[in-house]
């Protein structure tokens, strides 16, 4: 295929290919190499047809992939993550964007006010709720763009937003993995050459103090980063390393090689120790009564630098001096921190974005990024902090609590990684044609520092213990839950409280999780549940939604409907209000034989159940069952009953209570938590053609 030699993209591709081939053999003639590359391009180049659709003007045009790519270079539309193109902000006013910016600015203002209050105070909580509502308002616009009933609906906006967010978060994720964990893999030799091209053009002057690296050292390191082993690749990598200068080999070797860069260069490790030495160690106070004595104890503190002359003002000053906010380092270390950051940005960080970074999120092993949420990367820095503490600080705690030293080291790393995140996101923004005056709006801030984190098996499910929030110390170290079912409305308040107690007592408080202690506690709790049910206490039972039967296409399939109707049949003078949230009790009264005991002891109840349930004509207690080519109705019997708050399970029904299923259902919300600790479960209970009482039972078996 004949290639367009005036194409911007084609020329960029050829230029990079020529540079790569010359790295294999610098003695080659550059003009001849370029002609060779052009010839290969003509032989291999593919330019598929594409369709351009403008859903605002209802225009559709045909083109080729290359023509579209070159058009984006010339006209610079905003490029979304799924290939949707938008008119640039400097070409037309976007009222919706302004609306979102105003909402987010309001949120930022509320958060700033929130952090002036004492964490946990009513004022703090109220402002936290308000800023959260602003966030939901902004997010609701995104939801509206995907709803056809919304004024904001656009068939491309929703996917464009979703996939752009994926691109942004995966851009940061791959950078974090590469920079902090040296976890970068090249899927082929072309990607390695592309990365080398970026690295060798990143620093204009390479300093002489960088440690010299041999050809073998660099070659082995680069080859270890290849996704697959290949002798031909190994030979090519060695030839490239041979043709690099001594300075270039050093530059390439230390890129993404953070720990080795620190350990090999005394001037870098000295900067880290100097930062720790020069932090002022001050104590926080609990009340305003302690303020005057603390000022007397520290006459070197200028009271004019305090925001207020009370405990809040003092503690704010202390937290800044202890470097608890990586975005606001104290003056005592600022120069050293900036210097260290420049070295790390120049000689460790690489401004590189893998083309398949979204794919890598799900398919490549991670070493640093523990959890990826909608707009968050949660990083594990424990390994780096431990290494610096042992090998750079050599155990010196500088006469302060070791926890504060960990905060200092974490925030020293975070100061650097924040700069790296800003750089890679600014680069992504420029590639996406964001106007220069808008560069920087896309950013990633350091919001939380977790002391502990437990990650569930399902996506976006985790338990954390928070120490810092945007540089503010929360001395209570609260436990936060995300994604687990037990914090949802279907779990009773008593069970939610019990599970939180288990998590705090056996997972958060101990140095290592006490799995055996948790399982023993659960066994004792099972007996308490049985006793409470028998004595009329229903606080542990799961909650269901009691709604009108007209709200369901198949009401008989809803346990809440069957259970509510059964209660109302037995208690016509005390019916369950609709809608409401009664307690759900599992039963095992599948056949008339199961309720035979009622004939003599509870004859009126027996007659009602025979008529209204086992000879049901409403369809609530029956289900269609296929027999050959025909369908017949089969009775589901009594497999559940709803009990409103403040009422007891009817005495006649008590012998039918399925305690095992009830206990397993009550404890079901804790199973995902136990799975984190390796605790296994197995299915128990009956399944009939008309009902399913199968539940998962917790065992004392642990998977290693």
Predicted regions and their residues:
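Conserved acidic
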Residues: 1-704
């Amino acid at each position: 295929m004949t290639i367009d030699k005036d194409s911007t993209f084609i020329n960029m591709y050829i230029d990079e290919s020529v540079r790569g081939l010359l790295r294999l053999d610098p003695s080659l003639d550059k003009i001849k190499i370029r002609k060779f590359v052009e010839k290969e391009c003509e032989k291999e180049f593919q330019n598929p047809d594409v369709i351009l659709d403008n859903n605002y003007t209802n225009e559709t045009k045909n083109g080729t992939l290359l023509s579209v790519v070159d058009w984006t270079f010339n006209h610079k539309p905003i490029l979304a993550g799924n290939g949707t193109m938008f008119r640039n902000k400097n070409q037309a006013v976007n009222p919706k964007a302004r609306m979102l910016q105003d909402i987010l600015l309001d949120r930022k203002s509320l958060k700033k006010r929130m952090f002036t209050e004492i964490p946990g105070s009513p004022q703090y909580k109220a402002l936290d709720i308000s800023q959260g509502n602003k966030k939901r308002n902004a997010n609701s616009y995104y939801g509206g763009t995907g709803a056809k009933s919304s004024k904001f609906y656009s068939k491309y906006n929703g996917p464009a937003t979703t996939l752009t967010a994926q691109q942004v978060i995966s851009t940061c994720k791959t950078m974090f993995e590469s920079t902090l964990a040296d976890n970068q893999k090249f899927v082929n030799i072309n990607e390695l050459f592309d990365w080398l091209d970026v690295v060798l053009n990143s620093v204009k002057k390479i300093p002489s103090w960088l440690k010299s690296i041999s050809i073998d050292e660099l070659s082995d390191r680069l080859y270890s980063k290849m996704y697959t082993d290949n002798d031909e690749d190994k030979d090519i990598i060695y030839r490239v390393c041979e043709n690099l200068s001594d300075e270039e080999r050093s530059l390439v070797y230390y890129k993404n090689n953070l720990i080795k860069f620190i350990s090999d260069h005394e001037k870098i490790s000295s900067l880290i120790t100097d930062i720790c030495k020069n932090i002022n160690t001050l104590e926080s106070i609990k009340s305003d009564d302690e303020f005057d004595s603390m000022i007397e104890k520290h006459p070197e503190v200028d009271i004019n630098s305090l925001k207020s002359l009370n405990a809040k003002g003092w503690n704010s000053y202390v937290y800044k001096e202890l470097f608890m906010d990586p975005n606001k380092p104290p003056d005592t270390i600022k120069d050293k921190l900036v210097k260290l950051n420049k070295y790390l940005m120049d000689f460790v960080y690489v401004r590189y974005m893998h083309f398949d970074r979204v794919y890598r999120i799900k398919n490549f092993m991670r070493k640093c990024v523990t959890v990826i949420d909608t707009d968050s990367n949660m990083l594990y820095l424990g390994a780096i902090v431990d290494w610096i503490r042992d090998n750079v600080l050599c155990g010196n705690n500088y006469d302060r609590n070791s926890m504060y030293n960990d905060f200092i080291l974490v925030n020293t790393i975070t100061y650097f990684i924040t700069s790296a995140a800003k750089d890679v996101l600014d680069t992504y923004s420029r590639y996406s044609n964001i106007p220069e005056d808008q560069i920087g709006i896309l950013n990633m801030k350091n919001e939380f520092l977790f002391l502990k984190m437990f990650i569930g098996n399902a996506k976006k499910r985790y338990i954390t213990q928070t120490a810092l929030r945007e540089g503010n110390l929360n001395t209570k170290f609260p436990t936060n839950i995300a994604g687990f079912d037990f914090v949802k409305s279907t779990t009773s308040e008593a069970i939610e409280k019990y599970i939180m107690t288990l998590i705090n007592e056996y997972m958060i408080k101990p140095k290592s999780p006490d799995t055996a202690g948790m399982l023993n506690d659960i066994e004792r709790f099972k007996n308490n549940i049985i006793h409470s049910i028998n004595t009329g206490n229903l606080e542990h039972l799961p909650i269901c939604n009691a709604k009108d039967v007209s709200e369901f296409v198949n009401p008989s399939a809803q346990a809440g409907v069957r259970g509510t109707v059964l209660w109302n049949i037995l208690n016509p003078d005390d019916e369950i209000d609709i809608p409401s949230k009664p307690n759900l009790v599992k039963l095992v009264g599948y056949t008339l034989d199961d309720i035979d005991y009622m004939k003599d002891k509870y004859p009126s109840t027996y007659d009602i159940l025979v008529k209204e349930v086992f000879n049901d004509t409403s369809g609530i207690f029956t289900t269609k069952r296929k027999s050959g080519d025909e369908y017949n109705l089969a009775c589901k019997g009594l497999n559940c009953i709803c009990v409103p708050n403040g009422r007891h399970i009817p005495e006649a029904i008590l012998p039918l209570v399925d305690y095992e299923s009830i206990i397993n259902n009550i404890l079901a919300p804790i199973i995902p938590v136990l799975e984190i600790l390796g605790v296994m479960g197995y299915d128990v209970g009956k399944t009939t053609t008309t009902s399913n009482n199968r539940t998962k039972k917790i065992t004392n078996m642990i998977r290693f």
